[in-house]
Amino acid sequence: MRLKDAIPKKGSQQRGRRVGRGISAGQGASCGKGMRGQKSRSGGSTRPGFEGGQNPLYRRLPKLKGFPMVNRKKYTIINVSKLSSLPANTEVTLASLIKVGIITTDDGPLKILGDGDLNIPLKVYAAAFTASARSKIEAAGGSCEEIGPAQAVSNEDSTKE
């Protein structure tokens, strides 16, 4: 195929509308724009976002600094200081904390934060630990084990084993 063989498809190229060339053309005098008014003038269109003079949407909404993450992980959080009320060598899971009454709501997988002191050894199973929480639990002689979010919210039967 050569460049001379590339011709446009029949009917694809139409001539532009010739306006203002007399009444016999069908687009004479006002060129199909009606009578008077802003829309009949040259350059007579409004800018994008113009709402006729009322306060536009982009000025009604506040200037937002960033936007919230759509897929943010939501955790049930608890500080190390709350775990100090448990007896020594207890297996700590989300289900056991709800059963004891330390946590009242299940907002998602368990995350241990490092605020406060801990001086009893515990076996803690959670979806996430902060670095300070992990160091405080291990310094007290306990152990930290990260489990997946699916295991963190599993039923109580699996925690009794």
From Swiss-Prot:
Task: Give UniProt keywords alphabetically.
Answer: Ribonucleoprotein, Ribosomal protein, RNA-binding, rRNA-binding
Would you identify the family this protein belongs to, as annotated?
Belongs to the universal ribosomal protein uL15 family.
Source species of the chain? Trichodesmium erythraeum (strain IMS101)
Please give one Gene Ontology molecular function term for this protein: structural constituent of ribosome
According to the UniProt record, which cysteines are disulfide-bonded?
none
Specify where the region named Disordered lies, as residue ranges.
1-57
- For bias type Gly residues, the affected ranges are 23-35
Pfam families linked to this entry: Ribosomal_L27A
Q: Which GO terms describe its biological process?
A: translation
User: Which HAMAP family would you find in this protein's record?
Assistant: Ribosomal_uL15
GO (cellular component) term, any one:
cytosolic large ribosomal subunit
Concerning PANTHER family, the annotation shows: 50S RIBOSOMAL PROTEIN L15, LARGE RIBOSOMAL SUBUNIT PROTEIN UL15M
Tell me if Ribonucleoprotein is a UniProt keyword of this record: yes
Q: Which InterPro entries match?
A: Ribosomal_uL15 (IPR030878), Ribosomal_uL15/eL18 (IPR021131), Ribosomal_uL15/eL18_sf (IPR036227), Ribosomal_uL15_bac-type (IPR005749), Ribosomal_uL15_CS (IPR001196)
* Protein name per its UniProtKB record: Large ribosomal subunit protein uL15
Q: Tell me, how does this one assemble? A: Part of the 50S ribosomal subunit.
What task does this protein carry out? Binds to the 23S rRNA.
